[in-house]
């Protein structure tokens, strides 16, 4: 399993959620993230960013590393926006939809926490941190 595959499966699962219809879901590894988030915030006043997963091995003594992949899903909104569907709402929906979600070929996602932060004068975000037990093979293998 490659970390990008986990990220793409999470993005696909969120894109299919009816309650998040119309909310752009951005995958961090797919090009210029800063401008894509700014464009989404400018057009839709909110978006969801699926960040690049991290990985903490519990064993790397073999050709396949076993451990925990950590993924952060950020629900971002304009601070001045009073429209229905705040970043907090989106984060709670994402946590609910993704917690215990089986990810084919990987395992089951588990929600670890939700936190908030102000990104700048115009935007704030709620981050949902998820983990999944998985193994990483050789990234050069197809």
Q: What are these regions, as identified by a protein language model?
A:
Residues 1-30, 35-142:
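Charged, amphipathic alpha-helical segments and their flanking helix caps
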């Amino acid at each position: 399993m490659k970390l990008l595959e986990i990220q793409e499966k999470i993005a696909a699962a969120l894109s299919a959620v009816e309650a998040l219809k119309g909310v752009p879901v951005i995958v961090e590894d797919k090009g210029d993230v800063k401008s894509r988030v700014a464009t989404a915030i400018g057009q839709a006043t909110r978006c969801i960013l699926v960040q690049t997963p991290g990985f903490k091995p519990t064993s790397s003594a073999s050709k396949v590393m076993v451990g925990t992949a950590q993924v952060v899903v950020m629900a971002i909104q304009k601070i001045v926006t009073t429209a229905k569907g705040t970043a907090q709402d989106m984060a709670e929906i994402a946590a609910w939809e993704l917690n215990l979600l089986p990810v084919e070929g990987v395992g089951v996602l588990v929600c670890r926490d939700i936190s908030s932060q102000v990104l700048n004068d115009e935007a704030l975000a709620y981050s949902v941190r998820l983990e999944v037990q998985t193994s990483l093979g050789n990234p050069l293998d197809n």
